[in-house]
């Protein structure tokens, strides 16, 4: 029987929570700090043990990073989408996932690209049972090839 490393579980929980916060911000117009505080308040009111507490540092970095670099992130994501797809055409939760994954690929080189992609695909699986996780995988893989080509074997 395998056990999950607590720090890995906390980072996974932070990614899931970041998507929820980014979604809340888009749906309600809440600013970054208000949305982060609301999420913290909700977690404090929840019974313990349902899932790992998120790594608050990573949660805050993702949400603040996406918020601060939204235009650049959307440019990267838009170029990674195929055909006539645009960032705006993506459903809001899916948009939050690819934005957060794109931010992590661009801003956290300490997270290996393949780990980053896998983690965000897992987040997509938490919300979707259809083709959406495949879209997340494709977009983030394209971005990883662009942003971290050497790590992904491109141009090596």
UniProtKB/Swiss-Prot annotation:
A GO cellular component entry from the record: cytosol
Swiss-Prot/TrEMBL keywords: RNA-binding, Transcription, Transcription antitermination, Transcription regulation
A GO term, aspect molecular function: RNA binding
UniProt GO BP: DNA-templated transcription termination; transcription antitermination
Source organism, top-level taxon: Bacteria
Family: Belongs to the NusB family.
Function (record text): Involved in transcription antitermination. Required for transcription of ribosomal RNA (rRNA) genes. Binds specifically to the boxA antiterminator sequence of the ribosomal RNA (rrn) operons.
Protein name: Transcription antitermination protein NusB
Organism annotation: Paramagnetospirillum magneticum (strain ATCC 700264 / AMB-1)
């Amino acid at each position: 029987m395998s056990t999950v490393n607590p720090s890995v579980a906390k980072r996974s929980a932070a990614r899931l929570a970041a998507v929820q916060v980014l979604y809340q911000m888009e749906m309600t117009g809440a600013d970054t700090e208000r949305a982060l505080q609301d999420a913290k308040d909700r977690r404090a009111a929840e019974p313990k043990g349902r899932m790992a507490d998120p790594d608050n540092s990573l949660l805050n970095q993702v949400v603040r990073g996406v918020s601060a670099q939204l235009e650049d992130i959307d440019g990267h994501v838009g170029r990674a989408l195929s055909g006539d797809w645009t960032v705006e055409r993506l459903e809001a939760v899916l948009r939050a996932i690819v934005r957060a994954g794109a931010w992590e690929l661009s801003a956290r080189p300490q997270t290996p690209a393949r780990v980053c992609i896998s983690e965000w695909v897992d987040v997509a699986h938490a919300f979707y049972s259809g083709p959406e996780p495949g879209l997340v995988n494709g977009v983030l893989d394209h971005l990883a090839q662009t942003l971290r080509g050497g790590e992904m074997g491109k141009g090596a």
